[in-house]
A protein has these predicted regions:
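Extended active-site neighborhood of metal-dependent phosphoesterases/phosphodiesterases
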Residues: 2-15, 85-159
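N-terminal active-site segment of His-dependent metallophosphoesterases
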Residues: 2-84, 89
Length: 159
C-alpha cells in the first residue's frame, strides 16, 4: 500500500491525497490493457507496456487510475489462467515508476476459471508499494468500493 507525503487512510474505504497548491495536479487514466503475461501474449504485452511507459514518461502524472481489465487470464489469448502471476508482474512493472496508482476491476481481470477471484486479487494489489486500494466495506456489494478524496493542505476536499 502506498505511503507518502500528503497521503493518509481514514478508514477501510476512505483515503485522503493532498494536492500541491503551486501547480496543476495530473491524473492519468488508463483502461483495458488486457495483459496476459503468457505464452501467447508476449508480443501484445510488450506493445501495451511500451505504450504505458511512453505515456507515463510524457505526462509525468501525480496519480494513475486503471479502470478495469488490466490483466486478461484467458487461456486461448494469453496462454495462461494464472491471474495471480499476471497481477504480480503488473505490480512490479507499474511500481518502478514510483507514482501512486489506483484501480477498479473490470470483467476480464477475474475470468471464469482464473486462479484468483476478486477478493484474492485485491489482496495482491494492496501489496503494491504505490497502490492505493481497499476492498471496501463488507456490507456493500463488490470488491474495491472506496473513495480517494483529493484535498488541500487543510484536508478540504477539492475533487
Amino acid at each position: 500500500m502506498f505511503c507518502g507525503d500528503g497521503f493518509r487512510q481514514k478508514d477501510e474505504e476512505t483515503f485522503f491525497l493532498e494536492i500541491p497548491e503551486n501547480r496543476d495536479y495530473k491524473i492519468l487514466q488508463l483502461t483495458d490493457l488486457h495483459l496476459g503475461f503468457g505464452l501467447f501474449s508476449h508480443k501484445k504485452d510488450k506493445m501495451a507496456l511500451d505504450a504505458v511507459t511512453k505515456i507515463i514518461n510524457r505526462t509525468s502524472p501525480d496519480l494513475i487510475v486503471f479502470t478495469g481489465d488490466i490483466i486478461f487470464p484467458f487461456l486461448p489469448k494469453a496462454g495462461t489462467m494464472n491471474n495471480k502471476k499476471q497481477a504480480e508482474r503488473f505490480i512490479r512493472f507499474i511500481d518502478r515508476f514510483k507514482i501512486p496508482y489506483t484501480l477498479v476491476f473490470g470483467n476480464h481481470d477475474c475470468e471464469m476459471g482464473a486462479k484468483c477471484g476478486r477478493e484474492q486479487l485485491a489482496d495482491i494489489f494492496t501489496n503494491g508499494k504505490y497502490c492505493i486500494f481497499s476492498k471496501g466495506r463488507k456490507d456493500i456489494f463488490g470488491v474495491g468500493n472506496f473513495f480517494i478524496n483529493l484535498t488541500d493542505n487543510q484536508e478540504n476536499v477539492l475533487m
